[in-house]
């Protein structure tokens, strides 16, 4: 069994449903300390939601003048769902038919193990490496993400820690290992809209104002609006409604209020304030009495095809003979926090097809190549 597969299995065996770390970071920290890393554990959050974060760094021969490449990821996993639907216990790593099964196998304990073993090999092969290697690991990525990467980035910024490159181990591959790198993510802007009407008996509509009827033209306008055209990196901004509720449940009462939950996934062509203004303008033009509670989940970020993306693409090509695709599709990630303090941020990891699913798994034969890709990226950028 390879060192990477062995460590992956050890991490999967840790029960680490958000915000629990389950001992994963201790395993990682001990391995890194053994090869000269300074490590720091930071616990954050309220008593009923304690988050564990790990910061680790090993400087190179160039000291503070050297480039810094950071591996970032999370040890927490989503809940298992019904245990009886799993073919094997989700926290007992199991190999069947060339697949390694277990919660977190794809998202993202295989990547974490590959980070560690790639770093061990790199340090052994390049003891005089010029640049620095860092790790930022949290147990609060799958949850609210209030006490994880975001606060660690604030700490790093406060201590003026420079970061040049960051590789996040999210599962980005689609059909085969190496076919996709995420070099950016769309922003997320959510809102809870309340449209006010006047409640009345349904037989006397002249005594009420039905917010469902009143809002219909505005809803149509919102759905039909082209918010932007996107660009070479991003698809056009999308607007989606996720929940609509009105009424008391009785069928003879005109509702007094309509509530709509909605979300923008937006490109770098739009700013949050522009989207807010345009949406509110549509509602005002429709003559609606409304209020909105806005939540900005994250701003979009993009890393062009520069040094980091180039090195990773070359490493993938060497290891897998695949010409990889750069993409910004999908949901948000902790990259939205890291991009504020790091010049170049990309995400790359194993196949994403089983993430968060029953019988989550990775291809066993992908584990060592993934580790090799990470090591070859280090060799190009900080050796």
From Swiss-Prot:
Highest taxon listed in the record's lineage: Bacteria
Sorted UniProt keywords: Amino-acid biosynthesis, Cobalt, Diaminopimelate biosynthesis, Hydrolase, Lysine biosynthesis, Metal-binding, Zinc
Any one Pfam family match given in the protein's UniProt record, by short name: Peptidase_M20
Binding locations of Zn(2+) 1: 74, 107, 170
An individual GO BP term: diaminopimelate biosynthetic process
An example molecular function term from Gene Ontology annotations: cobalt ion binding
Annotated cofactor note: Binds 2 Zn(2+) or Co(2+) ions per subunit.
Keyword Heme (UniProt): no
Catalysed reactions listed for this entry: N-succinyl-(2S,6S)-2,6-diaminopimelate + H2O = (2S,6S)-2,6-diaminopimelate + succinate
InterPro entries reported for this sequence: ArgE/DapE_CS, Bact_exopeptidase_dim_dom, DapE_proteobac, Peptidase_M20, Peptidase_M20_dimer, Peptidase_M20A
Recorded metabolic or biological pathway in which this protein acts: Amino-acid biosynthesis; L-lysine biosynthesis via DAP pathway; LL-2,6-diaminopimelate from (S)-tetrahydrodipicolinate (succinylase route): step 3/3
Essential cofactor(s): Zn(2+); Co(2+)
Binding site for Zn(2+) 2: 107, 142, 356
Leading EC class: hydrolase
EC number: 3.5.1.18
Active site, UniProt feature: 76, 141
Family note: Belongs to the peptidase M20A family. DapE subfamily.
Subunit description: Homodimer.
Record function comment: Catalyzes the hydrolysis of N-succinyl-L,L-diaminopimelic acid (SDAP), forming succinate and LL-2,6-diaminopimelate (DAP), an intermediate involved in the bacterial biosynthesis of lysine and meso-diaminopimelic acid, an essential component of bacterial cell walls.
HAMAP family: DapE
Name of protein: Succinyl-diaminopimelate desuccinylase
Organism of this sequence: Polynucleobacter asymbioticus (strain DSM 18221 / CIP 109841 / QLW-P1DMWA-1)
Biological classification of the source: Bacteria, Pseudomonadati, Pseudomonadota, Betaproteobacteria, Burkholderiales
Gene (UniProt): dapE
């Amino acid at each position: 069994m390879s060192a990477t597969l062995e460590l992956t299995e050890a991490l999967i065996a840790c029960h680490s449903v958000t915000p629990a770390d389950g001992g994963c970071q201790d395993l990682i920290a001990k391995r890194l300390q053994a090869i000269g890393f300074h490590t720091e554990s930071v616990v954050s959050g309220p008593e009923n939601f304690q988050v564990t974060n790990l910061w680790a760094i090993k400087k190179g021969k160039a000291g503070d003048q050297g480039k810094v490449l950071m591996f970032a990821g999370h040890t927490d996993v989503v809940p298992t769902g019904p245990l009886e639907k799993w073919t094997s216990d989700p926290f007992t790593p199991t190999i069947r038919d060339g697949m390694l099964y277990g919660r977190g196998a794809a998202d993202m304990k295989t990547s974490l193990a590959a980070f560690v073993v790639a770093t061990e090999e790199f340090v052994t092969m390049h003891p005089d490496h010029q640049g620095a290697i860092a790790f930022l690991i949290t147990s609060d990525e799958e949850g609210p993400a209030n006490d994880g990467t975001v606060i660690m980035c604030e700490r790093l910024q406060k201590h003026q820690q420079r970061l040049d490159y960051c590789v996040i181990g999210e599962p980005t591959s689609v059909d085969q290992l190496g076919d996709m790198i995420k070099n950016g993510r769309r922003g997320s802007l959510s809102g809870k809209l309340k449209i006010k009407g006047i409640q009345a008996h349904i037989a006397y509509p002249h005594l009420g104002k039905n917010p469902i009827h009143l809002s219909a033209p505005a809803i149509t306008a919102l759905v039909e609006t082209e918010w932007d055209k996107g660009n070479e990196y991003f698809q056009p901004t999308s607007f989606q409604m996720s929940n609509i509720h009105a009424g008391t449940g009785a069928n003879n009462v005109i509702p007094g209020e309509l509530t709509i939950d909605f979300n923008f996934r937006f490109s770098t062509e739009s700013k949050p304030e522009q989207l807010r203004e345009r949406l509110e303008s549509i509602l005002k033009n429709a003559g609606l009495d409304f209020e909105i509670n806005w939540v900005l989940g994250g701003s979009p970020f993009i890393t062009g095809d520069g040094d980091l993306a180039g090195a990773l693409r070359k490493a993938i090509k060497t290891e897998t003979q695949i010409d990889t695709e750069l993409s910004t599709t999908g949901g948000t990630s902790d990259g939205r926090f890291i991009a504020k303090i790091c010049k170049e941020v990309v995400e790359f990891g194993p196949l994403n097809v089983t993430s968060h699913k029953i019988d989550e798994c990775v291809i066993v034969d992908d584990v060592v190549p993934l580790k090799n890709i990470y090591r070859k990226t280090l060799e190009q950028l900080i050796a």
